[in-house]
Amino acid sequence: MDRQNIRIRLKAFDHRVLDHSTREIVNTAKRTGATVRGPIPLPTLIEKFTVNRSPHVDKKSREQFEIRTHKRVLDIVDPTPQTVDALMKLDLSAGVDVEIKL
């Protein structure tokens, strides 16, 4: 019989919020009897933006800003129906993007 997997990808700008949400998902899955692989940290995406400090002159004077997107992956192996229900009812922090694939 084919093994059922649930893959959960989490993205957030703040790594502390991301780790807290990951811990909540892992604890919920383990409490309902499923096995969890991960969390696996994926490479952090760093987007840098360079802008002129002055609107008029001084082209050499610039300022840089960056956005860091932290990512994690979890695999839930052989989830029970209770696991799926508990994950659907789970309320995660704002600012965490969750993608679920079956």
UniProtKB/Swiss-Prot annotation:
The lineage of its organism: Bacteria, Pseudomonadati, Pseudomonadota, Alphaproteobacteria, Caulobacterales. Involved in the binding of tRNA to the ribosomes. GO terms for biological process: translation. Pfam families: Ribosomal_S10. SUPFAM superfamilies: Ribosomal protein S10. GO terms for molecular function: structural constituent of ribosome; tRNA binding. Part of the 30S ribosomal subunit. Disulfide bonds: none annotated. The keyword Ribosomal protein applies. Keywords: Ribonucleoprotein, Ribosomal protein. This is Small ribosomal subunit protein uS10. Coiled coil: none annotated. InterPro entries: Ribosomal_uS10, Ribosomal_uS10_CS, Ribosomal_uS10_dom, Ribosomal_uS10_dom_sf. Belongs to the universal ribosomal protein uS10 family. The keyword ATP-binding does not apply. It comes from Caulobacter vibrioides (strain NA1000 / CB15N) (Caulobacter crescentus). It comes from the Bacteria. GO terms for cellular component: ribonucleoprotein complex; ribosome.
